[in-house]
């Protein structure tokens, strides 16, 4: 779950949007990665041959465009030291004016307050835990900045990564939601830009991904290909998202009907339906540490994930004549849910052989 509006985003009216399908419009002046090279997917190439070069400043950091203001919101629920790493690395991720708001969804210790005081962040809470999307919406209330960035508290920002992400948004026509390249702690790339799930694609992915990870259904769902290219995708992982404030307001933020999981899929679908583009920017890099707050309760998370999946697909296949399809999807997801819960249950220790 906020930068300059000199290119049409921000306090003025949003740029005109195409009706129906989102048009593929070119990028201009997207900030380059450290090696100075930017790669573009087909249809996303810059048209301005005089795009500015990235230059080193006196302190050795790359000079980037400094336009607008940003609100970074994050949702915390019993976080560990990853929240400190999140806030500490955020200070190196941007030279813009950044306001940080933490939604505390009911932490049982003082680390949220202590970290906020140390790094100058704000903490908001309504005293309940209504889920990730509701927490992000609470932290985004009365949004007065130009851009909003929603990010998990368990990510570590690479230097300048937030500026690179926002610069791409400022220079990509019709960009309504942008996401960085997510790295796992071991350095491997997490597939954070994906195609919207459909029944066939989702069923194939669910059935085959464990036994055949490279199957075509999973490859299509993960939208693999052009990993180094700025490209348009169906939706972006909610671990880190940047939206122009007018787009966030138009969409009303996250759908709070999703307690956890799929709120980012739903947001991506609504971004596209409104005529905006979901854009992945691999030159902006963050590391997703995947904190342990949910791993201690795998059954609860598995059930929340499947409940959200059913809710999303019920909306996609909502026509009366599709009722049998919804029933079949619901039954399949409930079966998969029980199998995953059973597999996640701790196994009793093996007894040694009797001598």
Residues covered by each model-derived region:
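Short, acidic, metal-binding catalytic loop of nucleotide-sugar glycosyltransferases
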Residues: 88-97
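Conserved donor NDP-sugar-binding/catalytic core segment of glycosyltransferases
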Residues: 158-191
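A conserved acidic beta->alpha catalytic loop
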Residues: 89, 102-112, 128
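Active-site-adjacent helix/loop segment of glycosyltransferases
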Residues: 9, 269-347
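A short, conserved alpha-helix in the catalytic core of glycosyltransferases
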Residues: 226-252, 256-285
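Short aromatic/hydrophobic "clamp" motif used to bind/position activated sugar donors
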Residues: 148
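Short, flexible, basic/aromatic active-site loop/helix in glycosyltransferases
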Residues: 197-233
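Glycine-rich, basic loop-to-helix element that forms the pyrophosphate-binding segment
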Residues: 125-143
């Amino acid at each position: 779950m906020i930068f300059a509006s000199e290119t049409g985003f921000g306090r003025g009216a949003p740029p005109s949007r195409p009706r129906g399908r989102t048009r593929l419009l070119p990028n201009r002046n997207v900030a380059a990665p450290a090696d100075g090279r930017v790669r573009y997917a087909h249809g996303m190439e810059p048209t301005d041959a005089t795009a500015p070069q990235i230059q080193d400043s006196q302190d050795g950091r790359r000079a980037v465009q400094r336009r607008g203001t940003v609100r970074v919101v994050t949702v915390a629920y019993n976080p560990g030291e990853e929240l400190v790493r999140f806030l500490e690395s955020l200070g190196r991720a941007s030279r813009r004016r950044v306001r940080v708001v933490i939604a505390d969804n009911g932490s049982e210790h003082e680390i949220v307050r202590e970290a906020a005081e140390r790094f100058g962040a704000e903490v908001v809470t309504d005293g309940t835990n209504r889920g990730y999307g509701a927490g992000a919406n609470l932290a985004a209330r009365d949004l007065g900045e130009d851009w909003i960035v929603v990010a998990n508290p368990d990510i570590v920002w690479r230097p300048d990564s937030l500026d690179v992400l926002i610069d791409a948004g400022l220079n990509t026509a019709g960009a309504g939601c942008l996401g960085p390249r997510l790295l796992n702690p071991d350095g491997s790339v997490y597939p954070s830009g994906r195609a919207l799930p459909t029944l066939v694609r989702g069923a194939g992915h669910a059935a085959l991904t464990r036994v055949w990870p490279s199957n075509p259904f999973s490859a299509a769902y993960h939208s693999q290909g052009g990993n180094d290219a700025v490209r348009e995708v169906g939706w972006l992982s909610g671990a880190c998202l940047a939206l122009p404030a007018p787009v966030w307001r138009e969409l009303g933020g996250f759908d709070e009907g999703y307690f956890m999981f799929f709120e980012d899929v739903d947001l991506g679908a609504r971004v596209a339906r409104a005529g905006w583009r979901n854009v992945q920017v691999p030159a902006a890099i963050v590391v997703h540490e995947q904190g342990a707050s949910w791993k201690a309760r795998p059954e609860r998370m598995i059930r929340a994930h499947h409940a959200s999946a059913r809710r999303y697909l019920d909306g996609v296949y909502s026509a009366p004549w599709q009722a049998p399809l919804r029933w079949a999807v619901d039954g399949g997801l409930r079966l998969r849910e029980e199998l995953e819960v059973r597999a996640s249950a701790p196994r009793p220790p093996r007894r040694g052989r009797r001598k």
